[in-house]
């Protein structure tokens, strides 16, 4: 197992090219060379396998040898197949192993079956951001435990997940949340007994403050906006789960729709599917000009230059997102958050032009119960 070996830590930027090539090939050509339990050659492949969640690493003593082993044979999917009984010995084990989150068909639109991946099943923040936060924290865990404190700017969900993880691992956290956020975020962080700074109108305003105060106080800045541990979480879990689930269900998967906040999960999805299943189109969804949708924003420049961008980016207004989410609730009994409503709206538009039978997947980052105040203006309509 990768965790049984000692290896000099590489930052993701150093091994992401190797990881992408490994995904594209689907096989590991050379073993990892060790002396005893220490990796001495093949560090990029070692960290790639570990970041992908492979359960095995082929090793040879002293020097690398040709092995040509498939990622599947190295346990690529093992960690996302879950526990049949769903019994866990700790909350950390729950967060790591309660996989995959559900994939459910919610609508037929013309020739398209529309499936929703329900990310509110993540237990800490009730959102996809549990994945991001766990990857950010575990990627810097030695530094975090040495310094004892973490600072981070967040629109809410990442901050909630970080505050929960702080209790699991035993460090303090200060989260910077904009005044425009729904009350769920600050209240949950306070419920965890951690510090929350509520000010400004956006995370863009708060990022310099979080960085400045982290440097002043000797805290670790997680920096979900620039740390590649963010999109790596979605290569390892979100994309891999969708790949496994769509194959299990026999889907004719043509497109995956996902909203863009930090753009971390879109980058993870685009990178994974372009390498492993290039016939699947990943579509990014952002707020239309003049619209505000919690947790997502417009991007003038792709923020993850080492990873693939979505094949297309679609604009959705806040009103369209809300009305589609409420329509889905009234059809299915499931109320997506506003960002999920935006992705569903984009998928429904695309389905109108679909000429053959196909399946689309929409990633729904969180539940609409967090946004009832915002939905209230459309209720009864």
Describe the role of every protein-language-model region.
Residues 30-34, 57, 144-152:
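Short N-terminal amphipathic alpha-helices
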Residues 1-4, 31, 117, 317:
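Helix N-cap / beta->alpha transition motif
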Residues 1-22, 291-305:
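Active-site-proximal helix-loop elements at catalytic-domain edges
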Residues 29, 36-79:
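Basic- and aromatic-enriched surface patches that contact anionic nucleotides/nucleic acids
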Residues 21, 51, 135-139:
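Residue-level signal for well-ordered alpha-helical scaffold segments within enzymatic catalytic domains
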Residues 69-381:
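PLP-dependent amino-acid enzyme catalytic core
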Residues 13, 30-31, 56-57, 174, ...:
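A local structural micro-motif
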Residues 6-38, 44, 50:
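Short alpha-helix boundary/capping and kink motifs at helix termini
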């Amino acid at each position: 197992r990768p965790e049984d070996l000692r290896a000099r830590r590489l930052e993701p930027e150093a091994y992401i090219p190797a990881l992408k090539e490994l995904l594209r090939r689907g096989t590991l050509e050379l073993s990892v060379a060790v002396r005893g339990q220490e990796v001495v050659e093949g560090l990029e492949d070692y960290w790639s396998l570990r970041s992908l969640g492979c359960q095995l690493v082929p090793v040879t003593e002293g020097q690398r040898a040709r092995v040509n082993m498939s990622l599947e044979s190295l346990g690529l999917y093992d960690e996302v197949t879950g526990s049949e009984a769903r019994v866990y010995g700790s909350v950390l084990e729950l967060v790591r192993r309660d996989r995959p989150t559900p994939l459910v068909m919610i609508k037929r639109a013309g020739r398209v079956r529309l499936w929703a991946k329900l990310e509110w099943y993540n237990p800490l923040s009730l959102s996809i951001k549990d994945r991001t936060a766990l990857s950010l924290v575990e990627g810097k865990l030695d530094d975090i435990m040495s310094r004892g404190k973490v600072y981070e700017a967040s629109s809410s969900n990442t901050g909630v997940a970080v505050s929960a993880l702080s209790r699991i691992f035993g460090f303090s956290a200060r989260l910077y949340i904009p005044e425009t956020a729904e009350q769920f975020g600050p209240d949950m962080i306070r419920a965890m007994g951690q510090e929350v700074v509520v000010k400004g109108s956006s995370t863009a305003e708060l990022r310099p403050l979080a960085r400045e105060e982290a440097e002043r106080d000797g805290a670790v800045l997680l920096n979900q906006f620039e740390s590649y541990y963010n999109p790596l979480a979605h290569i390892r879990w979100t994309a891999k789960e969708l790949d496994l689930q769509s194959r299990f269900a026999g889907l004719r998967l043509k497109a995956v729709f996902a909203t863009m906040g930090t753009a971390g999960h879109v980058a993870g999805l685009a990178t994974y599917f372009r390498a492993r299943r290039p016939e699947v189109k990943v579509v990014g969804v952002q707020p239309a000009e003049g619209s505000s949708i919690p947790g997502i924003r417009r991007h003038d420049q792709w923020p993850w230059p080492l990873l693939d961008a979505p094949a297309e980016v679609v604009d959705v207004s806040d009103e369209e997102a809300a009305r589609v989410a409420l329509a889905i609730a009234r059809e299915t009994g499931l109320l997506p958050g506003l960002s999920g409503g935006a992705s569903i709206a984009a998928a429904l538009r695309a389905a109108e032009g679909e000429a053959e039978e196909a399946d689309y997947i929409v990633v729904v980052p969180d539940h609409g119960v967090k946004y009832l105040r915002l939905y209230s203006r459309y209720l009864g309509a």
